[in-house]
Amino acid sequence: DTIAMLGAAASGDLDVLVLLGSDPLSDVPDADLAERGLAGAGTVIAVEMLPNASTLAHADLVLPAAAPTEVDGTFTNLEGRVSVAEQKVTPPGTARADWMIAAELALRLGADLGVESPESIRAEIAAVSPVHAELTETALADGRVEGVLISGSSIEAPSVSASTTPANDSYSLRLVAARRMYDNGTMLQASASSAGLAASVKVTLNPADFEKLGLDAGTVVKVISGRGELMAPLAADFGVPAGSAMIPANAPGSNANTLIDASASVTDVRVERA
């Protein structure tokens, strides 16, 4: 529970916060909470391949992690398909696999995770995860289909109780924070071929809302919520529901997470001419 952990850190109740390939300042929906959490933690340890905003501003210790092509392991996608990843190159310098770093960190903090190899980790995953119950070393070695093993277990959607959200005010729009394929992500920006593909932030509304606001596409506006504000040009898209404002998360220039309070079920915003 990322929000709960950051809340505990912000309150001074978390002695050590470990960031495993994580950039809370950019990725957590509530930027204010992320900042307070990182600042309030006793010690921040980052396990990272590349520097990011959170590690540069708050990490007390950075442990270099190996890239996926530098370690052995498996990947599980949302369909339950398990792909085998084999080490292609040697990690540079002192970089190590995430599980090695986690095991040694645990020992330094007084706990033994009992893992010594990727095989021992897969055995534990198979023991605790029904989806991976058939994930044996034999299945991985003999049951590949074009490099992919499909788990025999089905994934059931968790039951979630319905919650009520407050109604829109007559002057407000409901914020939709959207993810794009290309953004300010650490690995994307570290690649010269993909760094320039992230589009700058725009506030996208349904054309039906433009007349109500007295604004036109291309107008630079200020978007205000109870948490913060940002400035960006307007854009029109019939795909955005009327009464909503779509703003990309972690886009160059501004981030929708500056507007969001993670403790609230929804975020309503006001849009006005800048």
Where are these regions (language model features)?
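A cross-kingdom feature strongest in bacterial/archaeal respiratory oxidoreductases
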Residues: 1-94, 101, 108, 122-274
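Flexible, glycine/charged-enriched surface loops at secondary-structure junctions
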Residues: 113-120
